[in-house]
């Protein structure tokens, strides 16, 4: 009887150094061809490191243009610098295609803010205003600056209207020690046309448009990924 069926494959040399380099969720240490967009985010969000409120932002662009990965990269660097400086900076990323109701968004934020001894906020059952009050209370307790990222925010608005955006952009009038900024990410360049003007003016204080990558840029990016993930000499 032959041995384990996996042994032959396990004994072969792999072509890969790190398969994660080809994963859609991979976050590289460098973002080629997005230097301008990174700089625009940094120039706004640096206020958080001084305890001030960054402007709310909207990031636009077609799917695959780097909006989410750029935002994650910048916020990771922001949190790292905040720790180094002793400045509290909390970030929350919510994909509004999966978390697509007002209740679920605020419940997710409240849960991420929970500390030992806090009552859990249920997935359903509480009035939404009560959950929002919990968010305000917990943000104020933590203090510092809180940055909420609403990825695919257009999906949330298309499904449930802009009431949540109005509530979130009003948080700073309710917070005690904490401060809050919103980053909306949308695939729809005309997204704000569907918003109440009051919401649009609050949310769209600074806009960044991510243009699609051109062929040579895609080639450069794939080349970098290949050098990170595939053994030298394979290609």
Model-derived segments and spans:
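Dynamic helix-loop-helix/coil hinge segments at AAA+ ATPase domain boundaries and subdomain interfaces
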Residues: 20-39
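Walker A/P-loop nucleotide-binding motif
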Residues: 53-75
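Active-site catalytic microenvironments for nucleophilic, acid-base chemistry
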Residues: 77, 81, 112
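Short, charged/polar micro-motifs that form catalytic or ligand-binding hotspots
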Residues: 27-31, 60-65, 95-96, 154-158
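Mid-core helix/loop region of P-loop NTP-binding domains shared across ATPases and GTPases
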Residues: 2-6, 10-14, 18, 23, ...
């Amino acid at each position: 009887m032959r041995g384990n069926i996996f042994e032959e494959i396990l004994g072969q040399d792999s072509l890969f150094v790190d398969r994660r380099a080809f994963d859609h969720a991979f976050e590289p240490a460098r973002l080629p061809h997005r230097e301008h967009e990174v700089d625009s985010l940094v120039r706004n969000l640096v206020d958080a490191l001084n305890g001030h409120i960054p402007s709310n932002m909207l990031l636009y662009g077609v799917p695959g243009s780097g909006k989410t990965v750029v935002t994650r990269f910048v916020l990771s660097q922001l949190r790292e610098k905040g720790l180094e400086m002793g400045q509290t900076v909390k970030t929350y990323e919510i994909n509004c295609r999966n978390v697509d109701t007002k209740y679920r968004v605020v419940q997710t934020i409240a849960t991420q803010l929970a500390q030992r001894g806090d009552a859990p906020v249920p997935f359903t059952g509480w009035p939404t205003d009560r959950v929002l009050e919990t968010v305000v209370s917990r943000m104020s307790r933590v203090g510092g600056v809180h940055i909420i990222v609403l990825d695919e925010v257009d999906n949330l608005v298309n499904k449930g209207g802009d009431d949540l955006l109005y509530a979130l952009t009003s948080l700073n009038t309710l917070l005690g020690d904490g401060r809050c900024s919103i980053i909306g990410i949308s695939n729809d360049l005309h997204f704000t046309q569907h918003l109440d003007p009051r919401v649009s003016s609050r949310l769209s204080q600074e806009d960044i448009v991510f243009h699609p990558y051109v062929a040579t840029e895609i080639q450069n990016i794939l080349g970098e990924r290949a050098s990170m993930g595939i053994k030298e000499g394979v290609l």
